[in-house]
Amino acid sequence: MSSELSVDHLLGIKYLKPEDIELIFKTADHFKEVINRPIKKVPSLRDITIANLFFENSTRTRLSFELAEKRLSADVINFSAASSSVKKGETLIDTVNNILSMKVDMVVMRHPNPGAGIFLSKHVDASIINAGDGAHEHPTQALLDSYSIREKLGDVRGKKVVIVGDILHSRVALSNIFALKLQGAEVKVCGPKTLLPKHIESLGVGVEMNLKTALEWCDVANMLRVQNERMDISYFPSTREYVKQFGLNKKLLDSLKKEIVIMHPGPINRGVEITSDVADSEHAIILDQVQNGVAVRMAVIYLLASKIKQ
């Protein structure tokens, strides 16, 4: 296995090789041990400065990246579009170049426009990590999801994973499909027909419209929220109707003929895509995902920073 990534940026899962994912996971294993020690910090990136640029609201992802960076002893700059010159009409390139002029080595960016990270990587001299670009990709979320499956079930290869909910507007769904397929998992999607992208089968995934049938088939169910903030029209009759057809509750979970692993990338809309008694049950690894997110992001940052230092 190579000791370095094949890419200089993490722009999306589709740019990675299986060997890259394996290297990230092996590195994350090491950092998982580190963050469970009494002293959780390592001096690996004392000479690296990282800017977190968030042009969309975020809680878990932003905090997870910031904690990962500080655990690695990097210098961290946090940028919020809401309180910046972006509000005055400043372009993305001008914003980033102003920040890079302060000798920043790496940029972690969330942006509402698909492909923003790709665009940026072609115009600036810094390593770029995509922390979510519109409804396009969210690579570190997919990596931590696969890492959590690997930790729980031993391997991702050969596992059956169903992604349930708003697939159409979800960057998490797309990145997960790419990551899971790359590692040899079988993938199906389940949700209202109006929330499934056209030609989704072209990505090598199956489509199942019945939630119980999908759950009977899978080893892992990744429950996604309905992204109302990305909708300008109604995609289903009512929330009540959605819950009836695609909400996961304890009664449905208990009716299955086997045990499955429940995941959710957050934020959870309790009582909609998943009930509290399922989200808080022993079947769910939702908080494991959050903890693993720090270790996986430490691994990604460390491996990309290693290429900067060369």
Swiss-Prot record:
The keyword Transferase applies. L-aspartate binds at K88, R171, R225. InterPro entries: Asp/Orn_carbamoyltranf_P-bd, Asp/Orn_carbamoylTrfase, Asp/Orn_carbamoylTrfase_sf, Asp_carbamoyltransf, Asp_carbamoyltransf_Asp/Orn-bd. Pfam families: OTCace, OTCace_N. One of its GO terms (biological process) is 'de novo' UMP biosynthetic process. Its EC number is 2.1.3.2. It catalyses: carbamoyl phosphate + L-aspartate = N-carbamoyl-L-aspartate + phosphate + H(+). Heterododecamer (2C3:3R2) of six catalytic PyrB chains organized as two trimers (C3), and six regulatory PyrI chains organized as three dimers (R2). Belongs to the aspartate/ornithine carbamoyltransferase superfamily. ATCase family. PANTHER family: ASPARTATE CARBAMOYLTRANSFERASE, ORNITHINE CARBAMOYLTRANSFERASE, MITOCHONDRIAL. This is Aspartate carbamoyltransferase catalytic subunit. The lineage of its organism: Bacteria, Pseudomonadati, Bacteroidota, Flavobacteriia, Flavobacteriales. The gene is pyrB.
